[in-house]
Amino acid sequence: MMTDNSKTRVVVGMSGGVDSSVTALLLKEQGYDVIGVFMKNWDDTDEFGVCTATEDYKDVAAVADQIGIPYYSVNFEKEYWDRVFEYFLAEYRSGRTPNPDVMCNKEIKFKAFLDYAMTLGADYVATGHYAQIKRDENGVVHMLRGLDKGKDQTYFLSQLSQEQLQKTMFPLGHLQKSEVRAIAEQAGLATAKKKDSTGICFISEKNFKTFLSHYLPAQKGRMMTVDGRDMGEHAGLMYYTIGQRGGLGIGGQQGGDNKPWFVVGKDLSQNILYVGQGFYHESLMSTSLDASVIQFTREVPEEFTLECTAKFRYRQPDSKVTVHVKKDKAKVVFAEPQRAITPGQAVVFYDGHECLGGGIIDMAYKDGEPCQYI
């Protein structure tokens, strides 16, 4: 017997892209009562005075009309500024490299938007993220990696709570990106051939360095090797991240070998950028980290130890770790030394296909000694 979904209202976060368009289409085809909502999170008028959000909203309207669903626009610019952008700036100010997408999902898409959807009578919200939701026999929701390994977005969803996941659907989780495009083209959706957006949501195609300098004045300083050799001037610590290769302007200067130069450390108090040669420079390697803002996707004890795998950046294979959790903090010990563990980035825990949750990296250690990364 077919399930009658018509009494279940799903509010879809629609960005004007192909993924969220197909999300709305699939739910409509499955018989749900679907409403589309466009979130305006940033005043993003480009240098020609064209507001790109207006163009995206037109695409949302076109797709919603095509599939026959009502649609609305909601303005979250204030919430986004207060909860995501201020955090983003504060992290850069403190010498860290934040991941605003993780915070945007936690605070906007699955908090501000979820709350708004409830005022529309939603039973669930849905987005075009590549992740899967599975309910067990006890009604507990588990978040699994998206089937398309190259598109899996659980890393960015790792701060979601059980309460948030209970109200969430990810209709694209079992599909490959190529299948999603094919569905859009077959249905003749207005967004079928639209290219994927890249970069941080509020910077879009803008030059990151220029963008950041509008909000944080850059302080130039010295670029040094770990053993104290002066390598010239850096443009401002906020422009560099641990393990970065390009943009140092010292490619022609050699040490004792011809290996490329990398950012291997920062000293915020002295405004010094440390550089070293070699991808696996010893200063880039660490054996453990401290993390805070620890969030698990289901209820867990206040203190426990967990053996699992982890990712320390988005496109990276899993590594075996032991996690010692105490309330909202954790010490993560690596089975093998790891390269360029970056304060401000997310550490995300996995058990096979399941994403267990994660936290924000505060400090990396090498054999118990803090690494000079901030």
From Swiss-Prot:
InterPro entries: MnmA-like (IPR004506), MnmA-like_C (IPR046885), MnmA-like_central (IPR046884), MnmA-like_central_sf (IPR023382), Rossmann-like_a/b/a_fold (IPR014729). It holds the Pfam family tRNA_Me_trans_C. One of its GO terms (cellular component) is cytoplasm. Residues 99-101 are annotated as: Interaction with target base in tRNA. Keywords: ATP-binding, Cytoplasm, Disulfide bond, Nucleotide-binding, RNA-binding, Transferase, tRNA processing, tRNA-binding. Transmembrane segments: none annotated. This is tRNA-specific 2-thiouridylase MnmA. It comes from Streptococcus equi subsp. equi (strain 4047).
